[in-house]
Curated annotation (Swiss-Prot):
Active site: 121
Transferase listed as a keyword: yes
Keyword terms: Hydrolase, Nucleotide-binding, Transferase
Pfam families per UniProt: HIT
UniProt lineage: Eukaryota, Viridiplantae, Streptophyta, Embryophyta, Tracheophyta
Reaction catalysed by this enzyme: P(1),P(3)-bis(5'-adenosyl) triphosphate + H2O = AMP + ADP + 2 H(+); adenosine 5'-phosphosulfate + H2O = sulfate + AMP + 2 H(+); adenosine 5'-phosphosulfate + NH4(+) = adenosine 5'-phosphoramidate + sulfate + 2 H(+); adenosine 5'-phosphoramidate + H2O = AMP + NH4(+)
Source organism, top-level taxon: Eukaryota
Organism: Arabidopsis thaliana (Mouse-ear cress)
Protein name according to UniProt: Bifunctional bis(5'-adenosyl)-triphosphatase/adenylylsulfatase FHIT
Length: 180
């Protein structure tokens, strides 16, 4: 069992340095979809961060638990802590890297909340002034992108929005932010 120190300064040194992608991990699950490990730029034993197939803004990424968990309340305490600590670290690095001034973190938990992939995930969007005319428009845009993603992703078809290479290049750039 993973022993997380939520109030401590560190989690475990094994988590801190497990950022480098393991060559033994051939893929990650995102609901029913397999994610190419080249799209993943940060991972802990319980969570991973990946670039987005259809980003709303530059650096719009997702943080997910490694275990396929459909709803937020189904996460264990350790998974919940690790997921949010991962989101905090990823958000901080990407906000700085993209010279953003704020972050939007969002979870759509369940179909009526706009969740279309049955796997808990946190959207992280570094924000800049004027990126949306009205700040709350980002939530409508998230809902719309989730609906489009559900319609366009088909297990029997290739993803057409961004190429694997384009996503791998972005992930590689972000991965360098987390090297030990």
């Amino acid at each position: 069992m993973l022993n997380l120190q939520v109030t401590g300064k560190t989690i475990l040194s094994s988590i801190r340095c497990q950022r480098k992608m393991s060559s033994t991990c051939s893929s990650y699950a995102f609901g029913p979809y397999k994610i190419d490990p080249r799209e993943v730029f940060y991972a802990t034993p319980l969570s991973y961060a990946m670039v987005n197939l259809r980003p709303l803004l530059p650096a719009h990424v997702l943080v997910c638990p490694r275990r396929l968990v459909p709803r937020f309340t189904d996460l264990t305490a350790d998974e919940t802590s690790d997921l949010w600590l991962t989101a905090q670290k990823v958000g901080s690095k990407l906000e700085t890297f993209h010279n953003a001034s704020s972050l939007t973190l969002a979870i759509q938990d369940g179909p009526q909340a706009g969740q279309t992939v049955p796997h808990v995930h946190i959207h992280i969007l570094p924000r800049k002034g004027g990126d949306f005319e009205k700040n709350d428009e980002i939530y409508d845009a998230l809902d719309e992108k989730e609906k489009e993603l559900k319609q366009k992703l088909d297990l029997d078809k290739d993803r057409v929005d961004r190429s694997i290479q384009e996503m791998a290049d972005e992930a590689s750039q972000y991965r360098s932010l987390f090297d030990c």
